[in-house]
């Protein structure tokens, strides 16, 4: 008879794909999978997520002790309420009492997280930084940012800390997708890069932008804006390390060393300038889902293990 596994689940929900991970009580990854979001939620969000997880629990003869699910969204301090998900094909009805509905379906506790905290959790564990103060800047579609403090993602008084992309250091003639004027993401994000790229015909694909146009004034301005924002966060938090990643930084020929040098120019001397470390984030389809599973393991399996005979 196949041994039953005690596991937790991590889900990273994006607009295009849902990534899913099972992690055992021993802290090992049991299974990772990627599916198209539209296909998973076609029968309904709760039914689709429930069936996706239950299918793998049956396959591996596993019992799930908890789920952490990440969204590109604002998540309340209670870790059960989704405040805003502008980039997901979900309605208010889909999100209403979602944690309770998933718990009833899966018969295990459920918590939500902002997706950037999932990536942070993976990067911190992978780089053995769990006992340190760590900042992470993920330059992708937007400007993602997260803080690791006291052994966990720091989310602030109301659960929405870390919105570096929405500090008012952007283009004051533009309104951000969040509704506010002049957010950093208006001129420092993948969205801003795409707008610039599409202003006129280019003889190279967007993904090769840094190969051909690193020295273009707009691109240099974007790097400068990113450096100032990251340096500001370092001067405020005095971290041990800063993780740099995201889809834009993963593009070919992205000038990572230039960005670090620009950032260091604005750091307070002698500290934190002399001691802060810059670490490249790993790039994988499943980092977010594995980060969610790590958080679930920390949150739910210690309780189970304490009760186990």
Swiss-Prot record:
Q: What is its EC number?
A: 2.7.1.55
Q: Which UniProt keywords apply?
A: ATP-binding, Carbohydrate metabolism, Kinase, Nucleotide-binding, Transferase
Biological process according to GO: D-allose catabolic process
Which CDD domains does the record associate with it?
ASKHA_NBD_ROK_AlsK
Question: Which residues take part in binding ATP?
Answer: 10-17, 142-149
In what pathway does it function?
Carbohydrate degradation; D-allose degradation
According to the UniProt record, what class of enzyme is this?
A: transferase
- UniProt GO MF annotations: ATP binding; D-allose kinase activity; glucokinase activity; hexokinase activity
Q: Which reaction does it catalyse?
A: D-allose + ATP = D-allose 6-phosphate + ADP + H(+)
Give the signal peptide range: none
Indicate whether Secreted appears among the record's keywords.
Answer: no
**Protein family per UniProt:** Belongs to the ROK (NagC/XylR) family.
Summarize the protein's role.
Answer: Catalyzes the phosphorylation of D-allose to D-allose 6-phosphate. Also has low level glucokinase activity in vitro.
Protein name, entry field: D-allose kinase
Q: Which organism is it from?
A: Escherichia coli (strain K12)
